[in-house]
Design a protein with these regions (language model features):
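Structured secondary-structure scaffolds
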Residues: 1-177, 181, 208-209
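Residue-level recognition of alpha-helical structural elements
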Residues: 2-3, 153, 160, 201-204, ...
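Active-site-proximal binding-pocket segments
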Residues: 74, 138, 142, 148-151, ...
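Active-site lining segments that contact anionic ligands and/or coordinate catalytic metals
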Residues: 93, 202, 247-248
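Short, mixed-charge aromatic SLiMs
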Residues: 102-109, 158-160, 185-191, 269-276
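Amphipathic alpha-helical segments within well-ordered protein domains
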Residues: 120, 193, 250-251
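Amphipathic alpha-helical interaction elements
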Residues: 123, 197, 253-254
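Basic, alpha-helical terminal appendages of large translation-related enzymes
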Residues: 210-283
Length: 283
């Protein structure tokens, strides 16, 4: 991976770099030589420390818990920036994480190609949590991830509208008037914590859907509580299991889909009422 790539380069000859450029009109001039301008990467990297220090009064703002960067600027951040910090006697970031690219139909996003997707455009189409799901679910943590509006639309309808949204609506409608007590509050699954800590957001979401949402859907379809009388204890038992699973799903979704998590927990607390509208309407 990226770690091996950098370690391999460091084992070969690493040459000194010049921290200034000659006859560059824009940039910070070297104080003792006006013909020289500070190399843009040198002054830009300092901002991680200096700019953050300017806007916070917290003493523990440094070192960074995690330094997130794109793969094309790996060398500058994992070698040059680290060397600068060591030279200044400052702590290194606790972790550096390098991600790959979001691609549009196999091509890099480019203003000249006009294939850029803006977060605002996504939020208008899919809502804020819908967009968070689509972006996190396609997160290019190891390899480039191919995305596009139509791909996102299909994923949104399949995973959120038809699956999660439909499941929450069905259970809420079937459970009308029911009140389910919770003996202990659900906690975030250790596997989800582990994956989020590794920034494997797509895998974290996959685990949540597999473990809680898909299994609850399958359980509900298998047990068919709608075929049973409303006062049948078996029906109440099936719906109680489904509600508890959805509460667990909501707690696990909170770091990535906070609004959705809140709505699910609100829906299944107290005396349950049917939803007025789906969490994720089809698009």
């Amino acid at each position: 991976g990226k770690r091996s790539e950098i370690l391999s380069k460091l084992k070969s000859e690493v040459k000194d770099i010049s921290l200034s450029r000659e006859k560059v009109d824009w940039g910070i001039k070297v104080p003792w030589d006006e013909t020289q301008t500070v190399y843009v990467w040198f002054d830009a990297l300092i901002n991680y420390y200096s700019a953050t220090r300017m806007v916070t009064n917290k003493k523990d703002f440094w070192p960074a818990e995690i330094h997130l960067l794109g793969k094309e600027i790996l060398w500058f951040h994992t070698v040059i920036w680290q060397a600068m910090l060591l030279a200044a006697g400052l702590d290194l970031p606790k972790r550096t994480y390098t991600h790959s690219f979001y691609m549009i139909d196999g091509q890099k996003m480019s203003k000249s190609l006009g294939n850029v997707i803006s977060p605002g455009q996504l939020a208008e189409l899919f809502g804020v949590d819908g967009s968070r799901y689509l972006i996190a679910g396609s997160f290019p943590n190891k390899n480039d991830s191919d995305i596009g509006i139509e791909r996102f639309r299909e994923k949104y309808n399949a995973d959120l509208a038809n699956n999660l949204g439909n499941l929450v609506s069905r259970v809420a409608k079937l459970s009308e008037g029911l009140e389910v007590e919770q003996n202990e509050s659900p906690v975030i699954d250790n596997q989800v914590i582990e994956k989020i800590n590794k920034l494997e957001l797509d895998e974290a979401l996959g685990h949540i859907f597999d473990t809680y949402i898909d299994k609850t859907n399958n359980y509900l379809n298998q047990e068919s509580p709608w075929k049973l009388d409303k006062n049948d204890n078996k029906r109440k038992e099936i719906l109680t299991v489904s509600i508890l699973n959805l509460r667990k799903a909501a707690v696990n979704l909170a770091p990535i889909l906070p609004q959705t998590s809140e709505k699910i927990l609100e829906t299944f607390s107290g005396i349950i009422k049917p939803l007025e509208k789906s969490l994720f309407p089809r698009i």
